[in-house]
Amino acid sequence: DLAAYLKQNGKPAELRRPSVDAFKIDDETPGVEVVVENTEACPRYSGVTIKGVTVKESPEWLQNRLRVIGLRPINNVVDITNFILHELGQPLHSFDAGKIKGNKVIVKAAEAGTKFVTLDGVERTLTDRDLMICNVEEPMCIGGVFGGLDSGVTEETTDVFLESACFHPTWIRKTARRFGLNTDASFRFERGLDPNNTMYVLKRAALLIQELAGGKITGAVQDVYPAVAEPYTVEVTYEKINTLIGKDIPVETVKSILASLEMEIVSETAEGLTLHVPVYRIDVQRDVDVIAVSYTHLRAHE
């Protein structure tokens, strides 16, 4: 949105994302396997195993970047997941792969009444509407909300399983409210994330872990994505745009602004446009949503 605003004001800016071209599998030995049983609550789950890491204090530059946004450095692996959460907006979770029983991650709803101790040492009673990240024997993490006490990365960890997933906002919101857990991860998942971004973020994190903690990316990347998200189709009329903005906006200006917001015009008539809205714009699914996200740019042309 900022890049679009700058472009409309004669100051074009390009968003540059860190390259992940160096990502590769170093060892074909099988890593942790992933099974998603509840694809409604978890539309996409990506993960990768990194073996032979050295968990230690993060370098000063990483610690400083976390401190300036109010986060306490923990160790290099956890700090990387926290850093990338704020860099790219996608929550990550790191597990000690040695503690994943059966070498398998299973994403499923909890059995009602199951007891689970979270990272803060509190025992919680789960419901069948709480999505859990489990191994073959027990839950390890409340998906998208809070980690478990016994499955996280410590200084003794040598093998890491890195999770980059997309969880359904309603599931996350209800679980977070039920347990009073308002975390950085739940805050973002509740508002909806782009499922098409999980693999890029996973690769970015894995490369940074290799850079700061060593290790080899082991086995195939796990990526369960049964129903690929497609762009939203939205129809919007010039009359409605002008009515809600309170001023007649030139047609070419409207088109230019929508293009700068990465909304593709797939067809048009004298009355309006049919758009493909990017998947990452979770909150733009109606014509009024299109006008709302365009409002600042449209008002600038008064």
PLM regions and their residue ranges:
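RNA/tRNA-interacting regions in translation and RNA-turnover enzymes
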Residues: 1-299
